[in-house]
Design a protein with these regions (language model features):
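Flavin-dependent oxidoreductase catalytic core characteristic
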Residues: 1-207
Length: 207
């Protein structure tokens, strides 16, 4: 978190580093063929879904570079391009990059698990589907998912939440989060928070 209380201002730093690395090494991002999720089994496969994450990152990187190039050609200054003209694209790309790293780490971690593998797979899949739901319009427009599966994704997501909910206490315990930290309001109005019984954003979350 920054002094302004918004970690999104750091995203420009992430993207500037990404652009610098990409210009020297284009293989830094996904360079394979773009796929299409057309089968339910592919939707439930984390490795297949991770390719979509990489495609989203590549799409948003290309979109940003193209817009920056056009603006630069029209005489816009580097400052105006970064701070005003491409602010939304920069934030979206930084988020996509972080989510790609997260899903790849999830897959790597899953391969090292045994007893808790199925439990954690459900939670990793929930994370992945939440991202896909947010990016569903892009995926449909680009032909990365068939319309039928796109229409069923929310139903699969809700069903998996119900399935995973029974393990939530075990999962929280496995993260070794101190009990007192579960009761701390992470980002709420403290005056309002203390005006009524509120047992923490984690414990009290309505999932």
């Amino acid at each position: 978190m920054t002094a302004e209380g918004d970690n999104r201002v750091l995203m420009i730093k992430v993207v500037k580093d990404m652009l610098s690395i990409y210009m020297k090494n284009p293989e830094f991002v996904y360079g394979g063929e773009f796929i299409k999720i057309a089968d339910k089994n592919e939707l439930f496969c984390l490795k297949t879904v991770s390719v979509i994450f990489q495609m989203i990152e590549k799409f948003k990187l290309d979109r940003l570079i193209n817009k920056m190039t056009t603006l630069k050609g029209n005489g816009a200054s580097n400052y105006d391009i970064l701070m005003f003209e491409t602010s939304d694209e920069i934030q979206e790309l930084a988020l996509a990059h972080g989510e790609k790293l997260a899903i790849l780490h999830c897959i790597d971690s899953l391969e090292k698990l045994s007893a808790s593998k199925e439990v954690m797979r459900n939670y990793f899949l929930l994370f992945a589907w939440e991202v896909l739901l947010r990016e569903l319009s892009l995926m449909l427009l680009e032909g990365w998912i068939c319309p039928k599966l796109a229409g069923e994704l929310r139903e699969h997501y809700n069903a998996l939440i119900k399935k995973a909910a029974k393990d939530i206490d075990v999962v929280i315990d496995s993260l070794n989060i101190p009990v007192h930290a579960l009761q701390v309001p992470a980002a709420k109005d403290y005056i309002k928070y203390n005006s009524y019984p509120n047992y923490g954003e984690v414990v009290g979350a309505k999932l």
